């Protein structure tokens, strides 16, 4: 079965943050975990719901039963067939009202008129609020279309072109194009609506950047600053209907303006925070790149210095080894000129020495030659005797 064409928002963000958190933390909503089917939730609406305001009245000051069950429907994601069953239900008008609320929060704004048109003139009477004021289902549906506020809470905003088309369709049907006030739109912030607890709103709305819608009324409800009575008729007379809408409209205007300004300031703070984070990330990235490039430059320079020193050392060592080899070779191989001169010098010295000996002893070569012829035979015998020894004699 086809689901309802939604506006694309998550169901956790459909309601205001304060209301959503109160629903999720309520004991009654936790009891609804046991309801598993669509029909069980319908039976619970029939038995428990007696108004469709978002907050309970009296001293309870918590989320209403109707909105807890509406949130339960959010989690179930109803189909088109189930929604038609809700809108046409005959047992209780509050079952139908919860169905219309579901469409106002979940459905695409362009499809709202298609859903609501068959019920614009519905004359079934019921009391949307806890004050017992009666209205018809058709008026209630028109107020859901035309109003932005619903009993001190906010509806999703309908785009301006879609709203113009809705107003044009109502004009064609000769129906009012302004909210009638059945949903608390014209008396927003007054004491006859089931307001949220001030403590919850004051604490949670500030933390989430939302302006509490009750701020205009809490000043008037204070026992010290209570304004004098103005003859306000709660049951509603002609004079009250003429004056109170004007006051509530002006109050709503200023409250809306303040809330819009507050939201704009919060968004601007978020954007500035994001820009600051981006600038910080960019600085960190640039610093990391500079640090890496500096490290690479230092390592390259150290490597180049080391290679230069090593090459200089190698050239120096090679030159030293070549010089040593040359010196050794020169020492081992004397020049031939020095050798010839040495030989000549030695020959000269020998000749001079021989000349001196000849002068001293005479020329012995001639004497020996003369003696040799005379004594050749004798010398041979003597030599034989010398070689043979005494046995030869």
From Swiss-Prot:
Tissue distribution: Mostly expressed in siliques and leaves, also present in seedlings, flowers and stems, and, at low levels, in roots.
Entries under InterPro entries matching the protein? PRP38 (IPR005037), PRP38_C (IPR024767)
What biological process terms from GO does the record include?
A: mRNA processing; response to lithium ion; response to salt stress; RNA splicing
Q: Which superkingdom is the protein from?
A: Eukaryota
Where found in the cell?
A: Nucleus
Task: List the record's Gene Ontology CC terms alphabetically.
Answer: spliceosomal complex
Region Disordered: start-end pairs: 173-393
Q: Where is the composition biased (Basic and acidic residues)?
A: 249-312, 329-346, 356-385
Compositional bias segments (type: Basic residues): 313-325
Task: Supply the Pfam families for this chain.
Answer: PRP38, PRP38_assoc
What family is it from? Belongs to the PRP38 family.
User: By what name is this protein known?
Assistant: Pre-mRNA splicing factor SR-like 1
């Amino acid at each position: 079965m086809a689901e309802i064409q939604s506006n694309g928002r998550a169901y956790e963000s459909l309601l205001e943050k304060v209301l959503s958190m109160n629903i999720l933390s309520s004991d009654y909503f936790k009891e609804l975990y046991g309801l598993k089917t669509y029909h069980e939730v319908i039976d619970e609406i029939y038995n428990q719901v007696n108004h469709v305001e978002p907050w309970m009245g009296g001293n309870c000051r918590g989320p209403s039963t109707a909105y807890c069950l509406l949130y339960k429907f959010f989690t179930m994601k109803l189909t088109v067939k189930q929604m038609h069953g809700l809108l046409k239900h005959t047992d209780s008008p509050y079952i139908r009202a919860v169905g219309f609320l579901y469409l106002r929060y979940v459905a695409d704004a362009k499809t709202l008129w298609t859903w609501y048109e068959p019920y614009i003139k519905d004359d079934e009477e019921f009391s949307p609020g806890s004050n017992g004021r009666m209205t018809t289902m058709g008026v209630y549906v028109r107020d859901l279309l035309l109003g932005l506020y619903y009993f001190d809470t906010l509806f999703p905003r309908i785009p301006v072109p879609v709203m113009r088309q809705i107003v044009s369709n109502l004009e064609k049907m000769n129906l009012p194009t302004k909210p009638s006030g059945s949903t608390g739109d014209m008396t927003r912030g007054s004491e006859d609506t089931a307001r949220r607890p001030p403590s919850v709103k004051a604490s949670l709305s500030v933390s989430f950047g939302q302006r509490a819608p009750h701020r205009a009324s809490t000043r008037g409800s204070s026992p010290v600053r209570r304004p004098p009575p103005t003859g306000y008729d709660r049951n509603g007379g002609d004079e009250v209907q003429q004056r109170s809408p004007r006051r509530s409209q002006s109050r709503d205007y200023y409250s809306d303006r303040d809330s819009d300004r507050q939201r704009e300031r919060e968004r601007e703070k978020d954007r500035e925070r994001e820009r600051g984070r981006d600038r910080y990330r960019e600085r960190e990235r640039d610093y990391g790149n500079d640090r890496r490039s500096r490290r690479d430059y230092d390592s390259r320079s150290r490597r180049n210095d080391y290679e230069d020193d090593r090459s200089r050392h190698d050239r120096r060592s090679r030159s030293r080894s070549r010089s040593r080899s040359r010196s050794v070779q020169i020492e081992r191989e004397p020049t031939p000129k020095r050798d010839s001169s040495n030989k000549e010098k030695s020959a000269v010295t020998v000749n001079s020495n021989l000349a001196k000996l000849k002068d001293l002893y005479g020329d012995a070569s001639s004497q020996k030659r003369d003696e040799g012829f005379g004594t050749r035979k004798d010398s041979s015998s003597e030599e034989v005797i010398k070689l043979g020894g005494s046995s030869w004699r």
